[in-house]
Amino acid sequence: MLKIGIIGCGFIGGQICRAIDSGEIDAELYALCDSSESKAFGLAKSLNTCKPAYMKIEELISSVDLVVESASQNAVRFIVPQALKAGCSVMVLSVGALADKELRETLFGLAKKHNCKLYFPSGAVVGIDGINSAHAAGISSVTLTTRKPPSGLMGAPYVVEHGIELEKLEKETILFEGTASEAVKAFPANVNVAATISLAGIGFERTMVRVIADPSLSRNIHEINVEGEFGKFCTKVENLPSPENPKTSYLAALSAISTLKKILNPVQIGT
């Protein structure tokens, strides 16, 4: 049975743990790690059947078959290279870290050298399969428009640096327009989907992103427009925010669970 270690015990990490605990994912939840030991112990205690150990990063990496990173972009930079060098496959949720070209090339190179897998779930969007398919023929443009309630954008570096008073907004307001490379740095906890779209399609510099704050919304909305040799398509998803973290969409956790199930399933459906 596949041994899984989870680094990052927030909303998504917790949802994955509960999916394993319930038997939805047929794997062994072997270990947990978090910058807050109390959070990791609290999560472990809340489970019914699984009894994961709390481990430091190095011990966890050496003990499991698959590391699930659900912590932060900084965690990707620090942890994922270690895991790959140890011959351990990794599922990355803080995909925005890969906007760093040097890090991206390093991770891809290590995965190839050590015969490991890097998994990037679709996250809070739909249409990654279509982008993957369209890329084979050629894509001319990709645009992501993200709309969120102001509470879901609080604390973002771009908001802080520009002194944007989100709580005072009374109508839909465009906060940012730029490349995916710029977006994931400006909103590291909000637009990881921009990174996933970039990896599947035409890259971080050609993928365009628009971030909108809308006080009338109660959901996180992501719309993707793609054009190319194949024709064009548009996808739109209206996500319920996580009750624990309004910056995270519930669908992002479901996507991570689905990816783990796909890894374990001998039957593969879809692109």
Swiss-Prot record:
Q: Give a Pfam family name.
A: Asp_DH_C
Supply any other comment: The iminoaspartate product is unstable in aqueous solution and can decompose to oxaloacetate and ammonia.
Domain of life here?
Archaea
Q: What is this protein called?
A: L-aspartate dehydrogenase
Tell me, which GO biological process terms does this entry list?
Answer: NAD biosynthetic process
HAMAP family with a match to the protein in the record: NadX (MF_01265)
Q: Which family does the entry's similarity section mention?
A: Belongs to the L-aspartate dehydrogenase family.
Q: Which UniProt keywords apply?
A: NAD, NADP, Oxidoreductase, Pyridine nucleotide biosynthesis
- The active site is formed by 222
Write out the residues that bind NAD(+): 124, 192
This entry's Gene Ontology molecular function terms read: aspartate dehydrogenase activity; NAD binding; NADP binding; oxidoreductase activity, acting on the CH-NH2 group of donors, NAD or NADP as acceptor
Documented EC number(s) = 1.4.1.21
Catalysed conversion reaction? L-aspartate + NADP(+) + H2O = oxaloacetate + NH4(+) + NADPH + H(+); L-aspartate + NAD(+) + H2O = oxaloacetate + NH4(+) + NADH + H(+)
Q: What does this protein do?
A: Specifically catalyzes the NAD or NADP-dependent dehydrogenation of L-aspartate to iminoaspartate.
Metabolic or biological pathway, per its Swiss-Prot or TrEMBL entry: Cofactor biosynthesis; NAD(+) biosynthesis; iminoaspartate from L-aspartate (dehydrogenase route): step 1/1
Task: Output the InterPro entries linked to this UniProt entry.
Answer: Asp/hSer_DH_NAD-bd (IPR005106), Asp_DH (IPR002811), Asp_DH_arc (IPR022487), Asp_DH_prok (IPR020626), L-Asp_DH (IPR011182), NAD(P)-bd_dom_sf (IPR036291)
Which Gene3D superfamilies is this protein grouped with?
A: Dihydrodipicolinate Reductase, domain 2, NAD(P)-binding Rossmann-like Domain
